[in-house]
């Protein structure tokens, strides 16, 4: 009986080793492809929020990590991608969190030019209710295009609110919390850039390039 148990344990151990080895080999063979796909997805989003005619540098390499919970909605350092044309600063793409979405945190990226005018907004991830809050996603509606051409005049700019709160941005029928959260997050990101643009250009480019 003891011999049978030892044999069974040996077989299980060998199986575990083989399975682990297979996982490691698969990861080694696919990690470069996965990293490339992630880089291409990031590049696509960056070019959507910072138009190609606004920069000639590789945005995903011109990246600095910034830790500012008040502006970016999280105490985790967030990437800010600095755009330039012929060596001159022309804007940025700022990743930020709207922590007060209806179903949790909403991750966004905001593009601005050097005059702090919004050139694009995209939602990177969310858990909002399908058919209601998910209208922030460009695959559902183009609601985020309402930010294009806008800027923030002051930290307490009251126009940066949904119409229900006296602002300029549409809310969704039956889902005011979601657009309200995104509007506030975009406003904070734009104002942060507007008041820290010079400082951002002096920070180290310390994001990990995949």
From Swiss-Prot:
Gene Ontology annotations for the cellular component aspect, listed alphabetically: plasma membrane
Topology class, membrane: Single-pass membrane protein
Primary subcellular site in the record, as a coarse category: membrane
Alphabetized UniProt keyword annotations: Cell inner membrane, Cell membrane, Electron transport, Flavoprotein, FMN, Membrane, Phosphoprotein, Translocase, Transmembrane, Transmembrane helix, Transport
Cofactor(s) listed: FMN
Domain of life (superkingdom): Bacteria
Residue ranges crossing the lipid bilayer per the database entry: 9-29
InterPro entries attached to this UniProt entry: FMN-bd, Ion_transpt_RnfG/RsxG
Enzyme kind, highest EC tier: translocase
GO MF annotations, alphabetized: electron transfer activity; FMN binding
SMART domains the UniProt entry points to: FMN_bind
The EC number(s) this enzyme carries: 7.-.-.-
Residue numbers bearing the FMN phosphoryl threonine modification: 176
GO biological process: electron transport chain
Subcellular location: Cell inner membrane
Disulfide bond positions: none
Role summary: Part of a membrane-bound complex that couples electron transfer with translocation of ions across the membrane.
UniProt family annotation: Belongs to the RnfG family.
Subunit structure: The complex is composed of six subunits: RnfA, RnfB, RnfC, RnfD, RnfE and RnfG.
Protein name according to UniProt: Ion-translocating oxidoreductase complex subunit G
Organism, scientific name: Aliivibrio salmonicida (strain LFI1238) (Vibrio salmonicida (strain LFI1238))
């Amino acid at each position: 009986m003891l011999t049978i148990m030892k044999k069974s344990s040996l077989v299980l151990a060998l199986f575990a080793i083989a399975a682990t080895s297979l996982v490691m080999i698969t990861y080694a063979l696919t990690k470069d492809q996965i990293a490339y796909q992630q880089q291409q997805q990031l590049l696509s989003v960056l070019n959507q929020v910072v138009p190609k005619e606004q920069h000639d540098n590789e945005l995903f390499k011109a990246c600095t990590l910034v830790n500012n919970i008040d502006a970016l909605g999280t105490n985790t350092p967030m990437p800010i991608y600095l755009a330039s044309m012929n060596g001159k600063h022309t804007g940025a793409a700022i990743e930020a969190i709207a922590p007060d979405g209806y179903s949790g945190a909403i991750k966004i990226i905001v593009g601005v030019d050097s005059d702090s005018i919004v050139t694009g907004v995209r939602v990177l991830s969310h858990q909002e209710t399908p058919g209601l809050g998910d209208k922030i996603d460009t695959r559902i509606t183009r609601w985020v295009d309402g930010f294009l051409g806008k800027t923030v005049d002051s930290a307490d700019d009251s126009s940066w609110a949904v119409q229900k709160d006296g602002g300029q941005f549409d809310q969704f029928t039956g889902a005011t919390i979601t657009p309200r959260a995104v509007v506030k997050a975009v406003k904070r990101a734009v104002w942060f850039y507007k008041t820290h643009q010079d400082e951002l250009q002096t920070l180290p480019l310390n994001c990990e390039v995949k």
